[in-house]
Amino acid sequence: MSTSHLKKINTPEKLLGVLTAGHLVNDFYNVTLPFLLPTLIITFDLSFFQAGILSIATSLFSGLLQPVLGYAADRSGKRKAVILCGFLAFSVGLVAAGFATSYIMLVAAFFIFGLGKSTFHAQSTNFITSAFPTSRGRAMGIHGIGGSIGNFSAPIIATSLIVAFALREAVFLMAIPGILMVIFLAWTLSDQVSNQKQTPPLMISRKLILLAINFGLILMFYEAFLVFLPTFLIEAGSSLSEAGFIAAFMLFVGFLAQPVGGYIHDRMGGKVLFAASSITAAVALLVLTSGWDLPAILFIALIGASATATFPVALAMGSEIADGANVGLSVGMVFGVAGMLASVTPAMTGYIADLFDMQTAFRLLTVLALAAFGLSFFLPGKST
């Protein structure tokens, strides 16, 4: 195992702890937009389709960048610099959004913000899987806990700041964690320099493409659901604070689901986890939008748990397919393709909601989860 990335962090466990903290802040930013949207829709008089375009601005180009940055980091070993630039982009984008006075300026601000989404996952996965070669699923599950804490804290923090302050002050305050994480990681993390004497060939296998598309279908489903969940709940009669609490509960359950997903991966393989997660999410959303008098929060939580359980598994499977060569490219490919696919569904969902209603738009998302269920049977089996 290469230990060059442990120069400042002298054990794999400490490395995992530092990157889990980084994952917390990274994924806090990844789910911030949905909880800003209700206020942005009112402030800028946006349609649901225009709101969906903001999601495209944060995701499409970042999806293209992920495999490119992953491959560049594989060649240069400059993983630390890539990660730091990502957190800086999050903060700069939020500050720019605070100064935006038009829709075009808002799209540009969230484009900058979205660049931050292209940097962290591939680099942190390479660090962690090289440090934990025999327990990748468990390590990535623990790493996922940080992301889940960031996820479920985002609705509470974002909605609380918007209620307590004006939109501009709220986004300025939300930019602070990114700056603090740049300082923290600059001090604690060292670049990983490859020990390989020869550069491995650039290869994208059929297994990797299947994994990227399958994860992309799940992320398409989840991204659209998450982006419009607060709006859906507010239309159903919830206040902004209540919608934030329900979304936070869903993301808290996702916090519990990620290490469970990693455990299932290590024991039974990613194929089983992907199949079970996608069919469960589809059924739960059908029940949620059926109009039956059932506790909606439970089915919302089940949807969140099913989708987020696949996140650490997709990372672990991507690194396994790479088998030590071009891990950054492999993981960047999985998250990049998935991110690009997912970037279009919020706008599509918003367009359908403009034509019909949000309930109909949500119901149609089950097609994506069912497609992921069918494709999951072609994924690689348990790694031995």
Question: What label would you give each PLM region?
Answer:
Residues 324-356:
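A late C-terminal transmembrane helix in Major Facilitator Superfamily
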Residues 65-77, 258-269, 353-354:
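Helix-to-loop junctions at the C-terminal end of transmembrane segments
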Residues 110-146:
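Cytoplasmic helix-loop-helix junction between adjacent transmembrane helices
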Residues 33-34, 207-255:
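Extracytoplasmic gate region of multi-pass secondary transporters
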Residues 134, 142-187:
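Helix-loop-helix hairpin linking two adjacent transmembrane segments in secondary transporters
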Residues 271-317:
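C-terminal transmembrane helical hairpin of 12-TM major facilitator-type secondary transporters
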